[in-house]
C-alpha cells in the first residue's frame, strides 16, 4: 500500500485556521500554531460572552428604568410590583426604551403602577 502524505489536507486545515485568524495581531495571525491557540481562546470568549451579553443588557435596562422611576418618585422594586398588580405586561427592554425616549408616556405608566399599590 502506498504511503499517504498529508500535504493537501494539512494545507487546507492551515488555510482554514489562518483565514479565521484574520484581524489578530502579529504572529497570532501569521503562524499556524499561535493562530490556532488564539482561535481556540477567541471561540471560548465568544461563546461565554454571548451568554454574558444577555445579563449585561438586562442590567442596563434595570438601571435605566430605576433612574426614570426615581425621577417620578418611586423605587424600581415598588414600580415593578405595581406593574404586576395593575396587570401591565411590558418587559424591561420596552420599559427602558420608553423611559429614555418617551418620558411622558413612561410617567403615565408609573402613575398606573402607583394607583395599583
Swiss-Prot record:
Gene Ontology cellular-component terms listed: ribonucleoprotein complex; ribosome
Q: Which UniProt keywords apply?
A: Ribonucleoprotein, Ribosomal protein, RNA-binding, rRNA-binding
Gene Ontology BP terms: ribosomal large subunit assembly; translation
**Keyword DNA-binding assigned:** no
| Molecular function, one GO term | rRNA binding
Name the family: Belongs to the bacterial ribosomal protein bL20 family.
UniProt xrefs under NCBIfam families: rplT_bact
Reported function: Binds directly to 23S ribosomal RNA and is necessary for the in vitro assembly process of the 50S ribosomal subunit. It is not involved in the protein synthesizing functions of that subunit.
Q: What is this protein called?
A: Large ribosomal subunit protein bL20
The organism is Wolinella succinogenes (strain ATCC 29543 / DSM 1740 / CCUG 13145 / JCM 31913 / LMG 7466 / NCTC 11488 / FDC 602W)
Amino acid at each position: 500500500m502506498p504511503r499517504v502524505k498529508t500535504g493537501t489536507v494539512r494545507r487546507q486545515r492551515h488555510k482554514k485556521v489562518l483565514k479565521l485568524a484574520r484581524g489578530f495581531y502579529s504572529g497570532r495571525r501569521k503562524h499556524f500554531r499561535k493562530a490556532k491557540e488564539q482561535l481556540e481562546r477567541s471561540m471560548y470568549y465568544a461563546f461565554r460572552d454571548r451568554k454574558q451579553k444577555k445579563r449585561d443588557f438586562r442590567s442596563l435596562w434595570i438601571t435605566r428604568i430605576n433612574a426614570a422611576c426615581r425621577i417620578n418618585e418611586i423605587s424600581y422594586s415598588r414600580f415593578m410590583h405595581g406593574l404586576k398588580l395593575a396587570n401591565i405586561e411590558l418587559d424591561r427592554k420596552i420599559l427602558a426604551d420608553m423611559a429614555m425616549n418617551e418620558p411622558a408616556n413612561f410617567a403615565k405608566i408609573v402613575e398606573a403602577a402607583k394607583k395599583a399599590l
